[in-house]
């Protein structure tokens, strides 16, 4: 995801541009003050072999909701990346999935979040916990070496690189 727009942090629904999330069809209803709500009307492409929401779709929706809750507390130009996430699946999701996210605790660099997903009947589909790191958008892949300043350009990357 890219940096959040001003409108998403002031309560107007707008997800940051992300080709994967755009294709999924998730819609941000709100994200402000550490709380978010995201919906996904399930389509045939979202289903598993039993004709219910695929677990990966459910996990992605949880990730988006938790990340948007965390991002709603960030300043301009700051986004989040998922450090870890755990999802417990309670029952199959059908119809429209609605995910809520909430920041439990925020430090200078991290946000600890929780969320839940319910279906259009109000059934409890999943519970999620996640940790997110605040950061400015960085170059990735091959471009990252241009971003880092090393005293020895031939030095091998360390464990945190």
Model-derived regions: residue spans:
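Terminal targeting signals and extreme-terminal segments of soluble enzymes
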Residues: 1-161
